[in-house]
């Protein structure tokens, strides 16, 4: 089952009705069972045991149907987070529409676009931790480093990819897999688009989400990279 939640911003996915219409348009419903976790309320509220900013996380109530999760993320740049990967998918991706605004506003949904930036990044780490705790470690993470644009897929008009495809990373540690992706971007010194993506990551202090997640004990920034041809 593919799981998804509604967005917190205007567009084709901010209501259940519009989201289902888009899924039908792209024929997802012809191929996969899709569960919009927050299609119906009320939200499930997860307590965050160890946190920096927020102490609760609002997720779609249908999360209660599942006891494990395979987190598939398109690794790329992001206009607010600097980059998007496993940690963002765990937090913003699993959060309900209200929960997304709550994380962006560091606990104040009314500040979804105006809150302190670093506390937003730390709130993402907080929220990610609550989902990890909920599943008790029954999780795996796949980051796809393909079509590497500075923009998220959620952008109405995303900038074309600026770097060559790098590969697909798999881990049971969301911190390690995101850190490895960043390291591979920095290692691609001969790619003419590298500087553009790094500028997006650094200008938004993207690494801070990884720093916060590691400090919260969600995983390790140290890893062994095993390459499979």
Task: List each language-model region with its residue ranges.
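Extended, low-polarity segments enriched in aliphatic/aromatic residues
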Residues: 1-229
């Amino acid at each position: 089952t593919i799981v998804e939640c509604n967005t917190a911003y205007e567009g084709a996915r901010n209501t259940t009705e519009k989201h289902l219409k888009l899924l039908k348009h792209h024929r997802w419903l012809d191929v996969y069972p899709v569960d919009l976790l927050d299609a119906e309320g009320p939200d499930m509220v997860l307590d965050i045991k160890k946190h920096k900013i927020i102490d609760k996380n609002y997720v779609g109530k249908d999360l209660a149907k599942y006891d494990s999760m395979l987190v598939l993320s398109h690794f790329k740049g992001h206009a607010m987070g600097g980059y998007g990967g496993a940690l963002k998918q765990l937090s913003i991706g699993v959060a309900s529409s209200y929960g997304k605004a709550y994380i962006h506003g560091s606990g104040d949904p009314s500040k979804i676009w105006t809150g302190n930036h670093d506390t937003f990044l730390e709130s993402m780490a907080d929220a990610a931790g609550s989902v990890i705790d909920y599943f008790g470690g029954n999780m795996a993470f796949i980051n796809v480093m393909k079509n590497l644009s500075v923009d998220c897929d959620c952008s109405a008009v995303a900038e074309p990819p600026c770097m060559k495809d790098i590969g697909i990373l798999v881990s049971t540690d969301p911190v390690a897999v995101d850190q490895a992706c960043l390291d591979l971007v920095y290692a691609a010194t001969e790619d003419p688009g590298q500087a553009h993506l790094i500028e997006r990551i650094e200008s938004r202090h993207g690494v801070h989400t990884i720093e916060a997640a590691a400090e919260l004990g969600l995983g390790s920034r140290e890893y062994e990279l095993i390459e499979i041809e």
